[in-house]
Regions:
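A generic structural signal for secondary-structure junctions
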Residues: 31-34, 118, 137-141, 220, ...
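Short glycine-enriched, charge-decorated loop/helix-capping segments at active-site entrances
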Residues: 39-47, 134-141, 204-207
């Protein structure tokens, strides 16, 4: 038996939010004025336990899931997270176990995560410009901390990271080229993400959206872009 979506496409990916806390306050995700931004989070007893998460993963693997993404909040804030990764990675049938993180805590955990069986890491980084980064992160964290986290991941053996960048007009769009250039020959993949409407929590404004076509043109004007074939059925990202 395989689980499918409403278009009858097989669902191979499972995304699990292991907690709602975060050490940053990104304006498009957890702005300071939101409940989470003000420090109002779920009590620990209301979060899925390690055993419950492991049980759910096993159930979904039996239904055809092969890839598991661990997200938050910031997953590395969860006590015992490395041990949770170890338990999930031991489940037969999982071909890809990934983490999405802001990378600030990676220097402490990267080697242990690699040893525990984590396969990939996606890092959220919206700008290399310190002022822009701090503005978008709610005046928390630094670019240096994120880059140190990326370096720690590389040294631990994570050779191909994904760098997620949410692009907003007149906020960080003017810094995109520097970020793309920084990672261009690194072996990592930069993913430019349009500012998405997720309700009124992140104060979404259409005027802040930079269409992907505009970004492609700016990048292509400096470096030739060639489309890359999709890697899986139903994939929505366009690769170059």
């Amino acid at each position: 038996m395989h689980i499918k979506d409403t278009l009858s496409r097989p669902l191979k990916d499972l995304r699990i939010s292991v907690l709602d806390r975060c050490n940053l306050r990104c304006t498009y995700c957890m702005p300071e004025e939101s409940l989470h931004g003000r420090g109002i989070f779920l009590r620990p007893q209301y979060l899925l336990s390690d055993g419950e998460i492991e049980f759910l993963v096993r159930v979904f693997v039996r239904l055809g899931v092969q890839k598991v993404r661990l997200t938050g909040g910031e997953p590395l804030l969860r006590p015992g997270f490395v041990e949770l990764v170890d338990r999930i990675s031991a489940i037969k049938g999982i071909t890809d176990l990934a983490l999405t993180t802001n990378a600030v805590l990676l220097p402490r955990h990267a080697r242990a995560l690699k040893k525990a069986g984590l396969g990939r890491i996606t890092v959220s980084l919206d700008s290399l410009d310190e002022t822009v980064f701090r503005k978008m992160a709610g005046e928390r964290g630094t670019v240096r901390e994120v880059l140190d986290g990326i370096e720690a991941a590389e040294q631990a053996g994570f050779s191909k990271l994904k760098i997620n960048t949410v692009v907003q007009r007149n906020i960080n769009d003017h810094t995109v080229m520097d970020l793309v250039g920084h990672f261009r020959n690194s072996g990592h993949t930069v993913r430019l993400i349009e500012f998405m409407d997720v309700g009124n929590v992140n104060q979404w404004d259409r005027k802040l959206v930079v269409p992907s076509a505009d970004l492609l043109k700016v990048i292509h004007d400096r470096w030739e872009l060639r489309p890359v074939a999709k890697q899986a059925v139903g994939e929505t990202a366009r690769r170059y």
